UniProtKB/Swiss-Prot annotation:
Gene3D superfamilies: Death Domain, Fas (1.10.533.10), DNA helicase RuvA subunit, C-terminal domain (1.10.8.10), Inhibitor Of Apoptosis Protein (2mihbC-IAP-1), Chain A (1.10.1170.10). It comes from Gallus gallus. Apoptotic suppressor. BIR repeats lie at residues 30-97, 176-242, 262-329. Belongs to the IAP family. This is Inhibitor of apoptosis protein. The lineage of its organism: Eukaryota, Metazoa, Chordata, Craniata, Vertebrata.
Amino acid sequence: MNIMDSSPLLASVMKQNAHCGELKYDFSCELYRMSTFSTFPVNVPVSERRLARAGFYYTGVQDKVKCFSCGLVLDNWQPGDNAMEKHKQVYPSCSFVQNMLSLNNLGLSTHSAFSPLVASNLSPSLRSMTLSPSFEQVGYFSGSFSSFPRDPVTTRAAEDLSHLRSKLQNPSMSTEEARLRTSHAWPLMCLWPAEVAKAGLDDLGTADKVACVNCGVKLSNWEPKDNAMSEHRRHFPNCPFVENLMRDQPSFNVSNVTMQTHEARVKTFINWPTRIPVQPEQLADAGFYYVGRNDDVKCFCCDGGLRCWESGDDPWIEHAKWFPRCEYLLRVKGGEFVSQVQARFPHLLWNSSCTTSDKPVDENMDPIIHFEPGESPSEDAIMMNTPVVKAALEMGFSRRLIKQTVQSKILATEENYKTVNDLVSELLTAEDEKREEEKERQFEEVASDDLSLIRKNRMALFQRLTSVLPILGSLLSAKVITELEHDVIKQTTQTPSQARELIDTVLVKGNAAASIFRNCLKDFDPVLYKDLFVEKSMKYVPTEDVSGLPMEEQLRRLQEERTCKVCMDKEVSIVFIPCGHLVVCKECAPSLRKCPICRGTIKGTVRTFLS
C-alpha cells in the first residue's frame, strides 16, 4: 500500500519538502508507521499510536502488526497489553527496543543531556529525535504535569534556552509576520505555521524545533493534536510574551466561570470512561469539561456540548466545526483555523446558530433543501431536510428520534426548530427520557405479581384493609419507609384513610414493600390475603356520599387526600397527564417518570392550585 494513497497528511508534507522523500517507505519513521493503521480494526484494545510508538506497523491482516526493525509479528491483542513491553519480552534483542531502553535510562534523571557519544550509538532515526548536545539542563514535560517521562523521544521536549536569549531576541523576529517567513520549510501539516508564529515561536529549521523569541524556551516533537499557544503557556506560563498576550487581549464572557482554568477542567474527568478514545487532556485543552454523563462534554466559554466521541476525533476540530463563534476557540486557535475547518464542512456554513449566543435563522430565508434518495417533497421530507435538522443528523442523533422531536415541536408551536442548540438540547432530553422509560420497562418486566395485584385492587383495599398498624411497623423495621412516613400514616385517625395512605405508599416504594405487605397480610388478615393473593378476586363497592358527614370530618379527609404520596409532607399540586392522578407535590414530581399509582408513563404535568 502506498502511503501517499492513504495519508493526505504525509502527502502534503512530501509535496512541500523534497528532502522528506526518503520517508515514503521508511518504516523507521513513526509517522509513517502510524499512517499504516488507517484500516486497523477499531475494536482492538491497544491504540494505534502505542503500537506505532513501539516500532510496529500494520500488516493489513486482522490485528497483526510487524516490527520494522526485527520483523517480529504480533497479533491477538488483549485488554491491558502494553505494546512496548510485549515487544521487549518476545524479542529483547531487537535493535529498536535496545535503543529505546537506552533512551529511557537516560531520561530518568531530572536534568540530563545527550552527549555526542551516547547519541552516536543510536540509530539514525532515533538520533534525529534527540536533543542537541550543546543544550544542557534539558527538561521534559508531559501534559500539564511537571514530572519527567520515561520516554523522552516520544514526548514534547521543552528546553530552557535562556542563555541564547540575545540571539533569539533578534528584532527581525519580533513580529508575527517575520516569524511566519521562517516557516517556509515547516515539516508538519497537523500544526499550521501561522499558529506557531502567533504563539511567539520561531522555526529553527531543524525538524519541528521552535523557540520563543522572548523567553528562550524550545519546543519539539509535536504531536498531531497539539496547540502551539497552549503548549507555550502550559510549559512556561511566566513567559513575558504569553503574559503580555493574555493581558492585552480583552476579556470575554464565559458560560461557566469555575471551568476557566485548564486544571479545573481536567479534574472533572476523574470518572471519564476509559473506553472513550479521546483523552481528557485533549478535551480540556480545547475548553471542554466533563458533565459526568456518558461521554458528554461542554465548553466553559460558549456552553457548546459534544458527545459520541470516536477514534481519531480532534476536540479542536470538532469545536471549530460545531461552535465556530466560540470566543475561547477564536482566541486560542485563531480565525484562520476555524475558517479552514468550516471549509471542510460546507453544509455547516449556513448555520449562524452553532453557539448558544447566535441568533436564530431568519424566518424569511428559504431553507436549503436536499432530498434523500426516494424522498419526495412532502411535508415530512421538508421537515427533515432543514439545515438545523441536517446538522443534528451529522452529529449522530438517530433520524427517528429527530423526526419525533421535530413533529412534537411543530404540533406544539406550529414551527420547526430555528437553532441547532435548541434542537440538540431537546434531543438530549428525549434520549434521557427514552433511557429512563427503558429502565422502567425492564423494572415492570421483573416487577412482582404482588405489586401488580395491589395496584389492580387499590380501591378495594382502601375499603377492606384493617390491619394497617402491623404492616406499617413491619415496613418501618425493614427500613422500607422512613420514620416521618410512618408517623404521618399512623397519626391519621380513621382506618380507611390510613389504608389509603398505606396502600399508596406501598405502590410508591415498589417490590420490597409489596413483599412485606403480603407476608403481614397473611398473618393478620388471612381472609383478605386469600381474596387478594390466592383467589385474586376483590370487588370494589363505591363508598357512601361524604356530604352528610360533619364538616370537621370532611376537612380531615380532604387534608389527608391532599398529602403528597412521595414525601408525605407537602400538599399535592401536580396532575399527571394522561392518567389524571393528583398524588404528588411540585417538588417530588420532576423525579418521576411514571405515575406511582397506576404506573402509566407521564407525558405531561399540570400545576394545580387547590382552594
